[in-house]
Amino acid sequence: MDEYKKAEILIEALPYICKFHDQKFVIKYGGHAMVNEQAKNWIAKDMVLLKYVGINPIIVHGGGPEINRAMEKMGKVPEFIHGLRVTDEETLEIVKMVLIGKINGDIVSKLEQYGGKSVGLSGKSGQLIKARKKIQYLIRDNEKIEVDLGMVGEVERVDTKLVDILVEKKYIPVISPIGVDEQNKDLNLNADIAAGDIAGAMNAEKLIMVTDVDGIMDDINDPKTLHRKLTISQIEKMIEKGIITGGMIPKIEACINALNKGVQSVHIVNGKIPHAVLLEIFTEEGIGTMILKD
């Protein structure tokens, strides 16, 4: 690439840097980008660059594949209902060990390797996420039945004071999705849903979902069917038609929840693409799917 082209790329980002200066972006970090070393580097560099150009990234991470591996090593079989992990006491201890004990620290170390200042938290830190036990329902034979997911929670409220202080002090917060209930008992939270609630509570400009797919497509096997921009009503029609199914539905519900709580836009990008977050934010066309309110 010649030097002029490099300059043009930098200049293309300028209006977006100006527009989003001092804004908060919540990044839900999951999927392949968490287990591939090169992808980890791309994400870490993207986050540090955002911070240095005046944007405030707040990371909420998952860890499904690593939790599954840890469970299998201990002779437990992972079980999911509607994309949510069934969590007994032993599973919860494994989840906390992997999320708080390993993944969170690894992300913090990677950010600091590239010049960022970062602090690892969980929803327990500073009473960040108060949660309640989630009640899940299934439809069987046209009958609505309640299913016990175990120690799985849903966000009741988010206290942003601690995260606000860290952002103001130029740190990149990294949050594990573990909440506490009114009895101070730990609950496992779906990371997508927690990220949406945190984004809403933080008055974030954007929620960016780093996933294993390019975005929302009519045909998952045909990249040409990728939608660059969708509204909530268009998304809801795609769910009705069965285009969006399975584990993608909790992600979409989290996206819609964030938009309804005041987040201006939600983006779904593929963490397997080098610097996908920067390409989505700082280029006209973007690289994934942007979702907006109607």
UniProtKB/Swiss-Prot annotation:
Compartments it resides in: Cytoplasm
Gene Ontology terms describing biological process: arginine biosynthetic process via ornithine; L-arginine biosynthetic process
Site note Transition state stabilizer, residues: K28, K251
The protein's enzyme class: transferase
Keyword Nucleus: no
Entry-linked InterPro entries: AceGlu_kinase-like_sf, AcgluKinase_fam, ArgB, Asp/Glu/Uridylate_kinase, Glu/AcGlu_kinase, NAGK-C
Reactions listed under catalytic activity: N-acetyl-L-glutamate + ATP = N-acetyl-L-glutamyl 5-phosphate + ADP
Gene3D superfamilies, sorted: Acetylglutamate kinase-like
Binding site for substrate: G63, G64, R85, N188
GO molecular function, one term: ATP binding
UniProt keywords, alphabetically: Amino-acid biosynthesis, Arginine biosynthesis, ATP-binding, Cytoplasm, Kinase, Nucleotide-binding, Transferase
Ion transport found in the keyword field: no
Enzyme Commission designation: 2.7.2.8
Pathway where this protein functions: Amino-acid biosynthesis; L-arginine biosynthesis; N(2)-acetyl-L-ornithine from L-glutamate: step 2/4
Broad class of the protein's primary localization: cytoplasm
CDD domains, A to Z: AAK_NAGK-C
GO annotation, cellular component aspect: cytoplasm
Record-linked HAMAP family: ArgB
Family the entry assigns: Belongs to the acetylglutamate kinase family. ArgB subfamily.
Function: Catalyzes the ATP-dependent phosphorylation of N-acetyl-L-glutamate.
UniProt name for this protein: Acetylglutamate kinase
Naturally occurring in which organism (per UniProt): Methanococcus vannielii (strain ATCC 35089 / DSM 1224 / JCM 13029 / OCM 148 / SB)
